[in-house]
């Protein structure tokens, strides 16, 4: 059931306004995508969809989802460029089974009916980054860990800055849940989608875990 003035009832534009975020002023056609890197490379497909926290982009290769982000302009352009470089191909507008499954599962996450994701992922990065991203996916729904705890779990307590950097390089929001990592003192720290969204996601998971799947706008 839709609760008036709750995020589920707000359009992306309304949420951005309520959260004090700038309006989205672009679509997929606004981005400058690079040239095809090889004659036989398969393009990455990019699909834009709406969520209770505003528009999101999902990118997928033939292997799986390689990007899932809130629409935040400069960060998106930087990540698109990096993704094209890493996969030696270009991004074009389109959908495949992976983008459709990701959109469906994210919708279920926001509805409070999904806590684990099944969509295939394709995460190009360094060995250390992939290790950090794998560890992020082991953080239980509704829980949080500090950067120090994350480094400890990786067996490298001194690697806090490196861990934070790998978290920041994560291109798959929510599914690879970097929003569950907080400061040692419990404070919210940087999040590519903005601290308002990070707070919302954490509160949403707590409410769902406690049996209340009707989120309130902060």
Question: Where would I find each of the regions flagged by the language model?
Answer:
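Basic nucleic-acid-binding alpha-helical/helix-turn surface characteristic of O6-alkylguanine DNA
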Residues: 15, 20-158, 204-218
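…primarily DNA-binding HTH/wHTH and HhH modules…
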Residues: 184-218
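Major-groove DNA-recognition helix of helix-turn-helix-type DNA-binding domains
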Residues: 171-175
């Amino acid at each position: 059931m839709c609760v008036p003035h709750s995020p589920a009832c707000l359009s992306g534009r309304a949420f951005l306004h309520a959260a004090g975020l700038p309006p989205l002023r672009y679509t997929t056609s606004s981005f400058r995508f690079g040239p095809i890197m090889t004659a036989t490379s398969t393009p990455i497909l990019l699909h834009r969809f709406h969520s209770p926290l505003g528009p999101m982009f999902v990118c997928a290769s033939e292997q799986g989802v390689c990007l899932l982000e809130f629409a935040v302009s400069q960060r998106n352009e930087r990540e698109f460029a990096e993704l094209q470089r890493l996969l030696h191909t270009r991004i074009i507008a389109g959908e495949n089974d992976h983008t459709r499954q990701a959109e469906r599962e994210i919708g279920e996450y926001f509805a409070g009916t999904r806590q684990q994701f099944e969509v295939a992922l394709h995460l190009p990065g360094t060995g250390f980054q992939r290790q950090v991203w794998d560890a992020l996916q082991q953080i239980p729904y509704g829980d949080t860990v500090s950067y120090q705890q994350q480094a400890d779990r990786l067996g490298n307590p001194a690697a806090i800055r490196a861990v934070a950097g790998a978290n920041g390089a994560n291109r798959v929001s929510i599914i690879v849940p970097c929003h569950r990592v907080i400061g040692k003192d419990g404070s919210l720290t940087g999040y590519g989608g903005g601290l308002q969204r990070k707070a919302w996601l954490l509160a949403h998971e707590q409410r769902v875990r406690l049996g209340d799947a009707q989120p309130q706008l902060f």
